[in-house]
Amino acid sequence: MKKAKRNPLLARLAGRLELTLDVRSDAAALPPPALIRRACQAALRRDVKQAQISIVIVDAAEGRQLNNDYRGKDYATNVLSFALNEGEPVEGLPLFGDLVLCAPVVEQEAAEQNKALMAHYAHLLVHGMLHLQGFDHEEDAEAEAMEVLETVIVKQLGYPDPYHEEHI
């Protein structure tokens, strides 16, 4: 009897984080699974004991449709975050959510902002993970706090400050 093969797109990290990856884009340059795992793990708060996150990479049409359906905005955006358990994580309960990255938008932004594409993917994964954990940037103070945290995490991953003026 043959042993069933493990799905290579499913990864467990330190018993805390389970990721699935669904690529629905034909973009040539996509973030490797190792980068996705590292960025998501780095952004996971220490008090989150378990998380199940789906990463979906889409094309512009699907990104636009999702942004329109869920946010009422008729354009494709770089990252959308969908938390199954909205807001602050509840102690003892797993964090569940989906991150949707729109590959053409990420590529365009990286080029326009003079950023390395993989650095931009890492930043957006961190940004999305923070949203799943209740962080927001609706108010100026929230935005500033979130940017500081993103910058610290992205630098820990070995990438430059995503908000530094030479990259914007």
From Swiss-Prot:
Domain of life: Bacteria
Binding sites annotated in the UniProt record for Zn(2+): 127, 131, 137
Cofactor(s) for this UniProt protein: Zn(2+)
GO cellular component, one term: cytoplasm
Keywords tagged on the record: Cytoplasm, Endonuclease, Hydrolase, Metal-binding, Nuclease, Ribosome biogenesis, rRNA processing, Zinc
KW Lipid metabolism (keyword) present: no
Family per similarity comment: Belongs to the endoribonuclease YbeY family.
The protein's name: Endoribonuclease YbeY
